[in-house]
Amino acid sequence: MDIQLGAPGQIIPPVDRGISLGIKMEKLGYDALWWPDHLMGWHPDTMWNEEFTPLARHQPSSHVHVDPFAMMAAIGAQTEQIRVGTCVTDLLRRHPASIAQTMLTLDHMTKGRAILGLGSGEQLNIEPYGIEWDKPVAKLAEGLEVIRLLMNAGNEKVDFEGKHFRLQDAVMGLDPYGDRHPEIWLAAHGPRMLSLTGQYADGWLPTKMSPEAYRDSLDRIHTGAREVGRNLDHFVPGMLGYLLVGPDEESVNRLLASEMIRMLCILMPNWVFESLGVPPPLGGDAGFHDFIPSRIPRHEVDRIIKAIPPKVSAHYAFAGTVEQLVEEIASYHAAGLRH
C-alpha cells in the first residue's frame, strides 16, 4: 500500500521542544508535518479542566496556538526531507498577496517542501477578532487566483479586478525555489469547494468521511479539473484524521465515548450527522463554521456532548487496534487516498 503519512506539528510552547519533535519526526520517517492556523481552539473554555482532560494540568487554556508559518520555517530550515504545511489557513485573515510572499519565502527556507493548506475559514478565528465573516468560499476562489497570479508573476506587473480582491500594477519579484510554485492543498467538502480543488489545487485535505463519500468527492475534483483542462497526474488526495489506537475493543470504545473526542465531532459537516441518523448537534443549519467556543456556556457543552453518540466518534476518527486501522486505511487507499 503506497501511502504517505503525516503527523501533527506541536502547537504549544515551548517551541524548542516543538522544533526538536519536528526533527525527530523526520528521523522516524514521517512524510509531512501539519499545523492548524488558529487563534482559538475548538474546545470551549467552560469544559477545559482536569475533570474533562488531563491536558488541563499542563496547558492552562484550550486556545494556545503558535503561529504555524513560524514553526514551518524553524523546522523546515533544520530538516532535509519532511514536508511542512498548514492544515489549514484562510484568506479572510490573511491577504492572498501576503500568503504568496510567505509561501515563496518558506519555499526557499525548506528547499521546496512547504505546502499551503487552505480552507474557507471558520467563524471562531474571524468574527470575534473584528474581521468580517462574509462569502468565505467566494473570497477563497478569488484569492486562489490572486495567489497563482503573484506566484507566477516573475518581474511582470499584475492586474486583477475581482469582487473581493483587487491588484493594480502589483509585483512579486520573489521567484519559487525550484521550477514550480509551492503546492496548494484545499480542505474541501462541498460541491463548490471540490470543484475549486480540481481547478486550482495540488492536493486535497478533507476531514474523515466514508470511503464511498471519499471516492465520490474525488470524482468531483477530477470533474472540476477537466472543466478547465487541468492535468491531475501529480495531484495528492489526502485526509486529516485522528487516530484512536487501543489493544482491544473495550479500550477503543472507552476512547470513542470520551467527552473530548465527542466534542471534536462538531467539526463534521451536518450531512455526515444526517447520514448516520443523528440530528446535527448545533441545531438548524448551524455547523462547525458557525461554532465559537469562547461563547459556549457549560450547560450547552453538556447538551452538545449528549447529542453526539459514540457511533459518531467512530465515524469521525480512525479507531481500533493496529490491525483494524491498517485494514480501514487500506479501504481508503482503494478509494484513492494517498496521504
Name every feature range the model reports, one short phrase each:
Residues L28, T79-I82, M109-T110, G154, ...:
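Short helix-capping segments at alpha-helix termini
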Residues I3-A7, L33-W35, V84-T86, A114-L118, ...:
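Hydrophobic faces of well-ordered beta-strands that scaffold small-molecule active sites
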Residues G29, D37, I75, L106, ...:
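Conserved, mostly hydrophobic/aromatic
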Residues Q4-D16, C87-A97, G178-H189, L243-V245, ...:
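Active-site mouth loops of central-metabolism enzymes
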Residues D134-D175, E212-A334:
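An alpha-helical appendage that flanks or caps ligand/catalytic pockets
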Residues M1-Q78, I82, P182:
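N-terminal beta1-alpha1-beta2 module of alpha/beta enzyme domains
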Residues L28, M109, Q199-Y200, A335-L337:
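Structural motif
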Residues P13-M25, I99-T102, A187-L196, L256, ...:
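Short, acidic/polar
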